Amino acid sequence: MPSNFVAKGAKAYEASMGRWSQRLAAPFLNFSGVPSRGRVLDAGCGTGSLTLALAAFPELDAIEALDFEENFVAALRSRTTDVRIRAQQGDVCALPYDNQEFDGVYSLLVLQFVSDAHRAVREMRRVLRPGAIAAAAVWSYGGMPSWRLFWDTVLALEPEATGRGVPSGRRPLTAEGELREVFESAGFTGVAETMLTIPMNYANFEDFWHPKVYGQGTFAAFFDALPTVRRDRLRDAMRAAYLGGDGDDGPRGFSSVAFAVRGMA
């Protein structure tokens, strides 16, 4: 079942999102817990941030990684020589594994893009052994100030951008309690939810601007089609918002929040 995530290659993904999932992986696993042995699954592995974090646990026997985007899978394969890791293309809504095959299943920053998150979470439970833990995390819509700064500025100046590469509203599961409800409805027990906070640090305005315009999604086509004067106006407004009244370009940091949920099969 296709996702509604528009991928534009592994390099663009790393610049726009992969670097942040690397920071989120460790606190996510601290909350989720990692089994003392056995097989685990990274469902929706992207370019491998969580997979490689799991590989830091030497007691794990095998680490499966799956993503809908073949180029992300290829990027992960190129990043590791760990013989425990097997990466393949596949659909989180139809996991290509047997029932009760895994000792842990994880999904980091994936389910808000899946067309049927309820089905995906049921699949996560299906492939878990009884008593094992599944966990997932999604960004909080209200807890992403750098992204709100960007998209709110776009919509203030270019309202017709809605639906043309610009989110028309918050994505599903990005409010408190929504992901928890999906886990509970899938039959998980002992469901727990928390908020994880990481810094999103940018070296300068270009480091902030370019990945958001030319990273994942379809906004770049809309932006490039604008008349030059409107492109310049939007970029200038975005730069002013990024600088925040400080005339000097340079590093800026934004604390960003994700909701994480875990449950027992």
Give the ranges of each region predicted by the language model.
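Conserved class I S-adenosyl-L-methionine
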Residues: M1-G38, S49-A53, F57, E70-R79
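Conserved catalytic/acceptor-binding region of the Class I
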Residues: H118-R119, R129-A203
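Class I SAM-dependent methyltransferase SAM/SAH-binding core
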Residues: R39-L95, H118-R119
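Conserved Class I S-adenosyl-L-methionine
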Residues: P2-V6, W20-S21, T47-S49, R171-A265
